[in-house]
């Protein structure tokens, strides 16, 4: 199993970043616009996200912990035999850290997922640091 991780330092408050992350149906508007171009909610905990390259993924929310500011989700179906992810927002001096981890099988998907994570991380940084309200 390939384990991928991104840690992004953001000049934005942990509260504001957590608010955007936990808004499961608005990832295309609040978290990573441009990278995610659309989100369709199938139920309270299942969404279909469409990405800039036309690919899509059906994701289920596994858990959402407000105290830890941690969201866990998994992809249902698709090319991955296993896809589990989590994102956590931590306080940091002058802003926060966004820690994103994905475990995926088969390992052959890792280069594609790694590239998508890099693009997603860049979109999140741009969006969250530009959001009104300051750090």
Q: How does the language model describe each region?
A:
Residues 75-127, 135:
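Beta-strand/loop substructures that line and gate deep hydrophobic ligand-binding cavities in soluble
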Residues 19-26, 66, 118, 122, ...:
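Short, intrinsically disordered, mixed-charge
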Residues 1-40:
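Hydrophobic ligand-binding cavity/cleft-lining segments
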Residues 10-12, 51, 75, 104:
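Short beta-strand-to-loop capping motifs
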Residues 25-31, 35-78, 84, 92, ...:
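Glycine-rich portal/gate segments that line the openings of hydrophobic small-molecule binding cavities
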Residues 16-18, 59, 71, 83, ...:
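Short acidic, gly/pro-rich beta-turn/loop elements at beta-sheet edges
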């Amino acid at each position: 199993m390939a384990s991928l991780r991104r840690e992004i330092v953001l000049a934005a408050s942990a509260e504001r970043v957590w608010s955007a992350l936990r808004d499961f149906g608005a990832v295309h508007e609040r978290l990573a616009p441009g990278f995610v171009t659309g989100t369709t909610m199938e139920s309270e905990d299942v969404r279909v996200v469409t990405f800039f390259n036309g690919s899509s993924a059906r994701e289920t929310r596994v858990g959402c912990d407000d105290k830890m500011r941690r969201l866990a989700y998994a992809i249902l179906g698709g090319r991955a035999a296993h896809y589990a992810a989590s994102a956590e927002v931590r306080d940091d001096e002058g802003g926060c850290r966004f820690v994103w981890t994905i475990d995926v099988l088969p390992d052959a998907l890792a280069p594609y997922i790694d590239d998508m994570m890099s693009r997603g991380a860049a979109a999140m940084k741009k969006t969250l640091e530009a959001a009104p309200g300051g750090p």
